[in-house]
């Protein structure tokens, strides 16, 4: 399945299981491509530490043009959370480093230990995914991978500060065999959500 297709499929299934329309073009004023004390509040020191641990260039970060970030989907109503589908490239050594620096007691809708374990297993392959791509604030080989891990933190740290419920994350390893919207796929996702949303 092509990159992005599985994400669309999972979004559709989650929407069906929750009986809630997925908003795939949702924007938030506070969900932009650089960190600030104003947006991160009590988690500012954590995101700043994470940024530094990834060897980010703070001057480049703070002077780059502010751009609204996309989330894979947003589910409103009683759910009020961002949904993210994590493919292999999200399980890098950079992502492992970010999770290790998360504040204690952070509420998330996924198993941090499992994400760390998967990052340990897949980091070599994930680190090599588009390895030569750089960004303005991560201007080195592997920079885009570091930026991806940095921005994943926004999806985990900001909701608590900005009045949303914790981000729902599902990874590709949890949904092996899900290839279409059918009764079996809906049941599998329903069982997964029972674990994640309790």
Language model features with spans:
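Nucleic-acid endo/exonuclease domains
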Residues: 1-198
């Amino acid at each position: 399945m092509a990159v992005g297709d599985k994400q669309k499929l999972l979004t559709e299934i989650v929407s069906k299981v929750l009986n809630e329309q997925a908003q795939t073009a949702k924007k938030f004023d506070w969900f932009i491509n650089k960190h600030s004390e104003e947006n991160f509040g009590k988690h500012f020191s954590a995101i700043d530490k994470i940024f530094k641990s990834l060897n980010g260039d703070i001057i480049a970060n703070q002077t780059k043009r502010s751009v609204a970030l996309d989330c894979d989907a947003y589910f409103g109503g009683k759910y009020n959370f961002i949904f993210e589908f994590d493919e292999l490239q999200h399980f890098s050594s950079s992502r492992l480093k970010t999770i290790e620096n998360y504040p204690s007691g952070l509420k998330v809708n996924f198993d941090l230990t499992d994400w760390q374990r998967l990052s340990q297993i897949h980091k070599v392959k994930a680190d090599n995914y588009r390895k030569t791509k750089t960004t303005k604030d991560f201007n080195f080989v592997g920079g885009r991978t570091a930026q991806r891990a940095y921005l994943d933190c926004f999806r985990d740290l900001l909701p608590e500060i900005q009045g949303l419920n914790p981000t729902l994350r599902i990874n590709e390893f949890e949904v092996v065999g899900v290839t279409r919207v059918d009764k079996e796929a809906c049941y599998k996702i329903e069982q997964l959500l029972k674990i994640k949303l309790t």
